[in-house]
A protein has these predicted regions:
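Bacterial N-terminal signal peptides
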Residues: 3-13
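Hinge/lid segment of periplasmic solute-binding proteins
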Residues: 120-134
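N-terminal secretory/targeting leader peptides
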Residues: 15-115, 131-132, 136-351
């Protein structure tokens, strides 16, 4: 692994543009194509950094997984494969147990700013977050549109319609869907279009933006917009060693750029949802809403499952249960006041 990383670093160094005197060149890599909404937000951020630096910074992008992998991106950044990259700790196979579990702690949040605020509350309260991201400097936290249920041949009007459906779903929803009688699987989203087209999958738990961005409107017929809770996660980062090598003025610029990058992601993600809904209507997708009583039942199962997964991390020496309960207190306050309050008393009951 170390030899492969070293070889890749040398190859990238050869591909990166040579910098003029006084210009710092930073490399950026992502698994997404340059036309993906995430990549459009990345480009917005790059343009801002280069403009604000007065030409003292150039960012060289590597798109479409040409350099950085999805599964090992955090390790690759720590080794300096590239300077900055997209990371997905919620999908990491190991070493990010709390990040994976916390993605199911977001019941009650409905907007991207709420998702980011709750993530930062938990991050500030639990040092395990920083431990799992050791060796990285986080440059953006990302939330997302609330998923619905896309299906091929059978509409989902109520929870009982999930029975027997083979659905691709994120890991935090697998046991919830099994409880409801579905047959959920976890597979890369890049494989879902083909699986839907061939009938290997009956559907996928995904937000409306995928109707266009992943072309699901071409191979599906129904969308239930039930708004399943989803979490935020550290999504863009720089290797810590590279971060420390930068001059203080450039580090300050990149610190200021965090808000810019997160806002660009939010704007592009929301625009993608509108585009997805339009694409769905153009392709004749039938849209449904889940009845309120079914949503309440789903959220109860979702919360119970999240608590069970938090308890299970005790075997790794991680007290995720305290973080789960903290998140539930914050969510209860959100329901009462409409605001995320990280200081909500630990003596208050959970929702």
């Amino acid at each position: 692994m170390r030899a492969l990383v070293l070889l890749a670093v040398l190859l990238i160094a050869g591909c990166a543009e040579r910098s003029a005197p006084g210009v710092t060149v930073l490399t950026y890599a992502t698994p997404y194509a340059p036309t993906h909404p995430f990549s459009r937000a990345d480009r917005d951020w790059m343009d801002w950094v280069e403009r604000e630096s007065g030409g003292r910074v150039r960012i060289v992008p590597f798109w479409s997984g040409s350099v950085l992998s999805s599964e090992h991106s955090m390790t690759e950044l720590r080794h300096g494969l590239v300077d900055i990259g997209t990371i997905t700790p919620i999908y990491a196979r190991g070493g990010a147990h709390l990040h994976r579990a916390q993605s199911g702690f977001y019941g009650g949040t409905s907007t991207i700013p709420q998702q980011l605020a709750l993530y930062r509350c938990m991050q500030a309260a639990d040092p395990q977050f920083a431990k799992e991201l050791q060796g990285l400097k986080v440059l953006a936290v990302q939330g997302g549109n609330l998923p619905g249920i896309v299906t091929r041949d059978r509409p989902v009007r109520r929870l009982e319609d999930l029975q027997g459906l083979r659905l691709r779903a994120p890991s935090e929803l697998l046991s919830v869907l099994r409880h409801l009688g579905a047959d959920p699987v976890d597979m890369p989203m890049s494989e879902v279009y083909s699986a839907l087209a061939k009938g290997v999958l009956d559907g996928v738990v995904a937000p409306a933006d995928t109707l266009r961005s992943l072309h699901f409107a071409e191979v599906a017929r129904y969308f239930n917009a039930m708004g399943i809770p989803r979490g935020a996660y550290a999504a863009r980062a720089m290797g810590e060693r590279r971060w420390r090598s930068l001059d203080p003025e450039l580090r300050q610029l990149l610190e200021r750029s965090i808000e810019v990058w997160e806002r660009a992601l939010e704007v592009r993600i929301l625009a993608a949802e509108e585009a997805g809904l339009r694409a769905g209507r153009e392709h004749g997708i039938e849209f449904y809403q889940m009845p309120a009583e079914d949503v309440a039942r789903f959220l109860k199962i979702y919360e119970s499952d999240a608590e069970a997964r938090a308890r299970s991390l005790a075997r790794f020496g991680i007290d995720a249960l305290s973080t789960f309960r903290f998140a539930r207190r914050i969510a209860a306050g959100l329901m009462e006041t409409g605001e995320i309050d990280c200081t909500r008393s630990t003596n208050e009951p959970t929702a």
